[in-house]
């Protein structure tokens, strides 16, 4: 264990099979939290659990779990509360997005699917976890917007993704207002391009990586751990006076 910053806290982290969700689950457990995870891809979740066992980290998981299905979300929340008697931290890291230029985008299979996979999944988890956070006397919700909630993604057909992440940003500010009387804090992290299984293919597109690097003040691509460190702060009591805020973790891209 790296520290006891999250000791005694119960964290529910979605999308632990890869990327940011995996990074947050491992980081939280290393700092003392009990972690319940989930993923729609069972194999990825099992890989994360294997890593956790090697380090003797307290991570369990419910998988496969389709967060666009309200029944699956409720099952996840109930399993977490049954195992740990409550929820202190909710990290909505799982997301799915389809990329297409507007003239080619299908309304049902791409636009609506992306809003379900980036916005609905956050709403459903927050709604189901809400009464349990209230019962604990408050807690921390950590959602993920994006640099593309602020700026266009040049050279990429990211219209639905930008809309979904912009929605997460606005929704989280409203959640912060509604949660404040209950001691519930809600914040967003807006990552730049993070190297994950989902982004590696696009990084191979000729010229794309170079375009991204040209926008960065800090000349390296982000890693899941860069985001997990910020999430650890927001999950901890160190951030007890922080709510309705957005943290840009993007190598300086949106400051240029």
Regions found by a protein language model. Give the residues of each.
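Short C-terminal tail/terminal secondary-structure segment
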Residues: 2-7, 232, 243-256
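Canonical Rossmann dinucleotide-binding motif of NAD(H)/NADP(H)-dependent dehydrogenases/reductases
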Residues: 4-36, 175
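Conserved glycine-rich Rossmann-like NAD(P)H-binding loop of the short-chain dehydrogenase/reductase
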Residues: 31-47
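Conserved mid-core segment of classical short-chain dehydrogenase/reductases
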Residues: 74, 97-112, 135, 154-160, ...
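Amphipathic alpha-helical dimer-interface segment in Rossmann-like NAD(P)H-dependent oxidoreductases
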Residues: 78, 117-135, 176-177, 181, ...
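Catalytic Tyr-X3-Lys loop
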Residues: 96, 107-124, 138, 142, ...
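Catalytic loop of short-chain dehydrogenase/reductase
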Residues: 142-167, 172-173, 177-181
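Short, small/polar-rich loop/turn modules that mediate ligand/substrate recognition or access, typified
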Residues: 180, 185, 242-244
């Amino acid at each position: 264990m790296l520290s006891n910053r999250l000791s005694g806290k119960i964290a529910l982290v979605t999308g632990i099979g890869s990327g940011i969700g995996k990074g947050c689950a491992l980081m939280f457990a290393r700092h003392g939290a009990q972690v319940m995870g989930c993923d729609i891809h069972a194999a990825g979740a099992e890989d994360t659990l294997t890593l956790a066992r090697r380090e003797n980290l307290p991570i369990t998981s419910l998988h496969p779990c389709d967060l666009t299905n309200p029944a699956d979300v409720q099952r996840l929340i109930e399993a977490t509360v049954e195992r740990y008697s409550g929820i202190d931290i909710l990290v909505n890291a799982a997301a799915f997005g389809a990329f297409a230029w507007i003239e080619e985008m299908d309304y049902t299979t791409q636009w609506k699917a992306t809003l379900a996979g980036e916005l609905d999944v956050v709403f459903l988890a927050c709604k189901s976890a809400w009464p349990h956070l209230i019962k604990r006397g408050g807690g921390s919700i950590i959602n993920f917007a994006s640099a593309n909630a602020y700026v266009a993604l040049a050279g990429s057909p990211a219209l639905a993704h930008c809309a979904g992440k912009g929605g997460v940003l606005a929704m989280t500010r409203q959640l912060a207002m509604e949660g404040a009387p209950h001691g519930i804090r809600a914040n967003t992290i807006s990552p730049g391009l993070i190297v994950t299984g989902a982004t590696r293919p696009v990084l191979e597109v000729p010229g794309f990586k170079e375009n991204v690097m040209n926008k960065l003040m800090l000349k390296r691509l982000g890693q899941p751990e860069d985001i997990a460190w910020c999430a650890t702060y927001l999950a901890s009591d160190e951030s007890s006076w922080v709510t309705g805020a957005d943290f840009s973790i993007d190598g300086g891209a949106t400051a240029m």
